[in-house]
């Protein structure tokens, strides 16, 4: 099972502590030894430790959508992701990976 961490600052001008998010993420290394990364914004910090099951090579998270507006971390498995992916491709979405997370 993967590991997920997050931090949100309500007060503008008090940015998220990137070192703290990194330390929280590292503390759950055992939950996702395959890889880990984080996303830091002014008020949001997200971390993810990955246990690779589907798309072993390119399913890194946090994942950013094609518009750059949304950042996602996810743990689980989407069993019908191939059907969802095909439907989204007919609507014009372009995928960067073969990971089930990207259909969200």
Regions found by a protein language model. Give the residues of each.
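N-terminus-centric sequence/structural signature that marks the extreme N-terminus
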Residues: 1-104
């Amino acid at each position: 099972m993967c590991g997920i961490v997050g931090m949100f600052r309500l007060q503008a001008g008090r940015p998220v502590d990137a070192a703290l998010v990194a330390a929280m993420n590292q503390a759950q290394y055992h939950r996702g030894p395959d890889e880990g990364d984080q996303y830091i914004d002014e008020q949001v910090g997200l971390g993810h430790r990955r246990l690779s099951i589907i798309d072993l090579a390119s399913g890194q998270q946090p994942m950013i959508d094609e518009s750059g507006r949304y950042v996602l971390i996810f743990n689980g498995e989407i069993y019908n992701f191939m059907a969802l992916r095909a439907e989204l491709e007919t609507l014009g979405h372009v995928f960067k990976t073969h990971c089930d997370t990207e259909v969200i």
